[in-house]
From Swiss-Prot:
Chain positions of Solcar repeats: 1-83, 97-191, 199-286
Keyword ATP-binding: no
N-terminal signal peptide: none
Any Pfam family matching the protein: Mito_carr
Organism field: Homo sapiens (Human)
Gene3D superfamilies: Mitochondrial carrier domain (1.50.40.10)
Family, per entry: Belongs to the mitochondrial carrier (TC 2.A.29) family.
Repeat keyword on record: yes
Xref: InterPro entries: Mit_carrier, Mitochondrial_Carrier, Mitochondrial_sb/sol_carrier, Mt_carrier_dom_sf
A GO cellular-component term linked to this record: mitochondrion
Cellular localisation: Mitochondrion inner membrane
Topology in the lipid bilayer: Multi-pass membrane protein
Main localization (coarse): mitochondrion
Protein name: Solute carrier family 25 member 45
Length: 288
């Protein structure tokens, strides 16, 4: 099993994470809290009360875990295609796989990624939702002192299953949308690349960016449910399950609640995934 795809996925994912985490923090706040009037209001309040560092809450743990999560995504995707088509990454330009194979490989990568991602994503969301202002004399300390303390607190207060809160919604989110992600990327690359050649840097950037947007527009409704399920149980249980969360959210906030965060998701998705795919492609070409 080639390991280059796993290593390239790790490095490219880390670059994309650093670029996109501030957008992700705003998105999570908009989905789980009703105190903000919109994206700009959320950004202003985060900066005013928590300083610039507020946008990077919860990032240290994803940086540490991205080695596992993105390696699984890109590694499983590429190696599933290897099994389905008997072609390596470089050979696929001359012998492009079918879109069905691409979709199946993407869904496989998304499904396995979700199980690796679930505990890390839960901790990230909990830390991002800490709205305490920057440290001042006499101010109360935040509930969680950091990712390790957060993980230990969840385990102690909610049990081992608590670390996988929202995992079912995460799996339903990632399995089909990662298939969409790779189909969009490959389709755009093929459209604007001469047959048998590698796509140009500009093509990779544009294809990666639009692949990110397409997948996140499809993912946003379940992403909202996932975020709310992850915050459920922090103080008291509100939802009986994913279906109850969906029904309660519609009843209280209307159908529009499912697309809360879609604008910030799209704004984040283009640059993050453009950089992710560009670094991924160039690392694999460099390794030959």
């Amino acid at each position: 099993m080639p390991v280059e795809e796993f290593v390239a996925g790790w490095i490219s994912g880390a670059l994309g994470l650093v670029l996109g985490h501030p957008f992700d923090t705003v998105k999570v706040r908009l989905q789980t809290q009703t105190t903000y009037r919109g994206i700009v209001d959320c950004m202003v309040k985060i900066y005013r009360h928590e300083s610039l560092l507020g946008f990077f809450k919860g990032m240290s743990f994803p940086i540490a875990s991205i080695a596992v999560v993105n390696s699984v995504l890109f590694g499983v995707y590429s190696n599933t295609l290897l099994v389905l088509t008997a072609t390596s990454h470089q050979e696929r330009r001359a012998q492009p796989p079918s879109y069905m194979h691409i979709f199946l490989a993407g869904c496989t990568g998304g499904f396995l990624q979700a199980y690796c991602l679930a505990p890390f994503d839960l901790i990230k969301v909990r830390l991002q939702n800490q709205t305490e202002p920057r440290a001042q004399p006499g101010s109360p300390p935040p509930r969680y002192q950091g990712p390790v303390h957060c993980a230990a607190s969840i385990f102690r207060e909610e049990g081992p299953r608590g670390l996988f809160r929202g995992a079912w919604a995460l799996t339903l989110r990632d399995t089909p949308t990662v298939g969409i992600y790779f189909i969009t990327y490959e389709g755009l690359c093929r459209q604007y690349t001469p047959e048998g050649q590698n796509p140009s840097s500009a093509t990779v950037l544009v294809a990666g960016g639009f692949a990110g947007i397409a997948s996140w527009v499809a993912a946003t409704p379940l992403d909202m449910i996932k975020s709310r399920m992850q915050m459920d149980g922090l103080r008291r249980r509100v939802y009986q399950g994913m279906l109850d969360c969906m029904v309660s959210s519609i009843r209280q906030e209307g159908l529009g609640v499912f697309f809360r965060g879609v604008t910030i998701n799209s704004a984040r998705a283009f640059p993050v995934n453009a950089v992710t795919f560009l670094s991924y492609e160039y690392l694999l070409r460099w390794w030959g």
